[in-house]
Amino acid sequence: MKRYIVLWIFAMTFMSSFAQCGIENNAFKSGEFVGYDLYFNWKFVWMKVGTASMSTVQSSFKGQDAYRCSLITRGNSKLDNMFVMRDTLLSYTTMDLAPLYYRKGAREGKRYYVDELWYTYPKGNCHLKQHEINSRGEHYWKESEYKDCIYDMMSIYLRARNFDASKLKVGDKIPMPIADASNISNSWLKYNGVTNVKMKNSDNKYRCLVFSFIEREDGKNHELIRFYITDDKNHLPVRLDMFLSFGSAKAYLTGYKGLRNEMTSKVE
């Protein structure tokens, strides 16, 4: 009997360590697929330069139930003439969205690199294993442990879709430290309120919640991405504004299937 009690306590401790970095998911379900068109500002003209597709399915990771989320971006011939872009991002999270694994394989220009992250949660902490393969093919490894939760660009996307905006005020900031293979950024999400957004590739309009992803570097705040997500239970991103070091880009929703909730934010 004592053995079962010990095992039960261990199991509860193990699960609670995940729970502190997770969040209840009410926004999406397994089988959601979303598509986007990508646009780049070239000499003050917006050009369509590629596509992005995202899928989320229930899977498993090291024997436990997990969400598997992937994002694939592909530039077209117009962009290839200026800057080759082939990115594939993969993320595994627990069913309550605590991150477990992240990988980014990216060809950007003449540079190809890989970022990998593994997450474990010993004693309620967040243990992070980082692996980098740089453009020269060199491998770098690092391990560290934190009392606070650490995320990546995919797991933060899933987490942000489940925020309760009714409890937020314009200007509120939500700390969100983001890791890649070599660094952890001092970053946060800022809530900017509600607005209507028209798609560039159609006449569809959506009532959206607006968030900015901001990173502090060299003593300055830098807005890297502005998210427009539907003001309904799906919290589906319909537009992203990306502020890049070499210009600006936008992504607009083109289609979706497998949503968990009714799309009630569409403006007629």
Tell where the protein language model's regions lie, with residue ranges.
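Active-site/ligand-binding surface loops and adjacent short beta/alpha elements
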Residues: 124-180
